[in-house]
């Protein structure tokens, strides 16, 4: 989900000179890459990693919701007998992360907590984080899957609704998609359209500290309305 293709946490240091030239110790970097863990079996995770400008790893999040047939092959032992295989990661399946975590930064330079979401994890309504104890949602994505279809636009639209539901701003970085800053009311503050490269800066983002009505009750609201209607 990032610009450094086929790069893992272990070999990220080869970009140290490039990063040091363009960033200072006042910067942190969020990079989408693969993390490979070796043990009894090799596990590969679609990851969002947070680094300082020396490319020292600060924290990492493993994607929880994987794309069937894209990132993993369901019923692999059975379906592989028919020649089916997933289409990414050199035909290896990604492993599933098991924690929807908040990344917290709390020092003299950086005081921020954010909820990392990778790719289409942003489309899930009411499943983001039970405690809602974060300042901003950061979503990275590779939308090249969709080509010239309506897909990247639909994917982006989901981000707007998540911002409204949670009362949190969303910072979205999407290769071959729409990158944007969305405020806690779902308004698009800044935007880079498809196939446009660039950057934008921001400060003093507002967000709702308390849980919103939706983040308290989630999609149970709609079941309640259905019961009333019946």
Model-derived features with residue positions:
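Enzyme catalytic cores with a strong preference for nitrogen-chemistry domains
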Residues: 1-230
């Amino acid at each position: 989900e990032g610009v450094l293709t086929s790069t893992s946490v272990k070999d990220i240091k080869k970009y140290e000179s490039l990063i040091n030239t363009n960033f200072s110790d006042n910067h942190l970097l969020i990079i989408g890459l693969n993390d490979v863990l070796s043990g009894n079996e090799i596990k590969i995770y679609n990851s969002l990693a947070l680094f300082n400008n020396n490319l020292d790893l600060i924290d990492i999040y493993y994607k929880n919701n994987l794309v069937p047939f894209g990132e993993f092959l369901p019923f692999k032992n059975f379906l592989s007998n028919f020649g089916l295989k997933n289409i990414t990661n050199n035909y290896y399946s990604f492993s599933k992360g098991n924690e929807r975590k908040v990344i917290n930064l709390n020092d003299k330079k950086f005081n921020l907590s954010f909820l990392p979401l990778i790719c289409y994890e942003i489309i899930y309504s009411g499943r983001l984080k039970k405690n809602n104890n974060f300042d901003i949602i950061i979503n990275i994505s590779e939308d090249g899957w969709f080509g010239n279809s309506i897909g990247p636009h639909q994917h982006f639209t989901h981000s707007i609704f998540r911002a409204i539901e949670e009362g949190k701003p969303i910072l979205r970085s999407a290769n071959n998609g729409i990158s944007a800053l969305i405020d806690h009311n779902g308004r698009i503050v800044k935007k880079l359209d498809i196939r446009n490269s660039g950057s934008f800066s921001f400060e003093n983002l507002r967000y709702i500290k308390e849980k919103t009505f939706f983040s308290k009750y989630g999609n149970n609201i709609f079941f309640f309305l259905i019961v009333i209607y019946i």
